[in-house]
């Protein structure tokens, strides 16, 4: 499946919630009516079946983190094979992706932009260049912007945006050096309450 490059508002309307795919502090423009489904007429949503609700939750999480279908299924299988709650394990695997950590540290204004920074070899982990967005960052790893990219305007602007929206507690960042430490894997209580991972577990358990 190809990566979606169309309007971000359309995805937000499809899922009925802000997916934080836009770069501004206010992610979705006021003209984007997320209460209405995509399309010219923007019909209101009717009652969904249990399966439909579960599927929409999976699609929402997949789009938030910018993960393709096959990748997401792989993460679920890995999460199910770990000790503990499968849903929490799944979210933690997604949070530990390098592109997501770069976003959480504020080096990219969106996860898509952060993924591009990684792919373009602008990011290092523990001093070594890593260009794989799905690379799993571990607690204690040092993630930094490489010297060649430190003066990019988009990185400076992204750090300013992050300062406005606030940075998560499980990363520590030196904005001058453009380097940060991934202090720990976040607990479920640290992550968004707008995600209902139990619906995803129910979907894959069928």
UniProtKB/Swiss-Prot annotation:
Q: Which UniProt keywords apply?
A: Ribonucleoprotein, Ribosomal protein, RNA-binding, rRNA-binding
Q: Where is the S4 RNA-binding domain?
A: 96-156
Task: Cite the InterPro entries for this sequence.
Answer: Ribosomal_uS4, Ribosomal_uS4_bac-type, Ribosomal_uS4_CS, Ribosomal_uS4_N, S4_RNA-bd, S4_RNA-bd_sf
Domain of life from the UniProt record? Bacteria
Q: How does it assemble?
A: Part of the 30S ribosomal subunit. Contacts protein S5. The interaction surface between S4 and S5 is involved in control of translational fidelity.
Q: Which family does it belong to?
A: Belongs to the universal ribosomal protein uS4 family.
This chain belongs to the protein called: Small ribosomal subunit protein uS4
| Organism this protein belongs to | Pseudomonas syringae pv. tomato (strain ATCC BAA-871 / DC3000)
Gene (name only): rpsD
């Amino acid at each position: 499946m190809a990566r979606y490059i169309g309007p971000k508002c359309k995805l937000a309307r499809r899922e009925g919630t802000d997916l934080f795919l836009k770069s501004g502090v206010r992610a979705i423009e006021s003209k984007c009516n997320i209460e209405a489904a995509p399309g010219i007429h923007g019909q209101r949503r009717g009652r969904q079946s249990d399966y439909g609700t579960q599927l929409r939750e999976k699609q929402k999480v997949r789009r938030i983190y910018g993960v393709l279908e096959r990748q997401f299924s792989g993460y679920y299988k890995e999460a199910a094979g770990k000790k503990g709650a499968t849903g929490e394990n799944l979210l933690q695997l997604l949070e530990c992706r390098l592109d997501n950590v770069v976003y959480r540290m504020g080096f990219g204004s969106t996860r898509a932009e952060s993924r591009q920074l990684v792919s373009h070899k602008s990011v290092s982990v523990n001093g070594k260049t890593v260009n794989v967005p799905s690379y799993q960052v571990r607690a204690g790893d040092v993630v930094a912007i490489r010297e060649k990219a430190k003066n990019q305007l988009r990185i400076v602007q992204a750090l300013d945006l992050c300062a406005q929206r606030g940075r998560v507690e499980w990363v520590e960042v030196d904005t001058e050096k453009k380097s940060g430490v991934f202090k720990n894997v976040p607990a479920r209580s640290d992550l968004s309450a707008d995600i209902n991972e139990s619906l995803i577990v129910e979907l894959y358990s069928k």
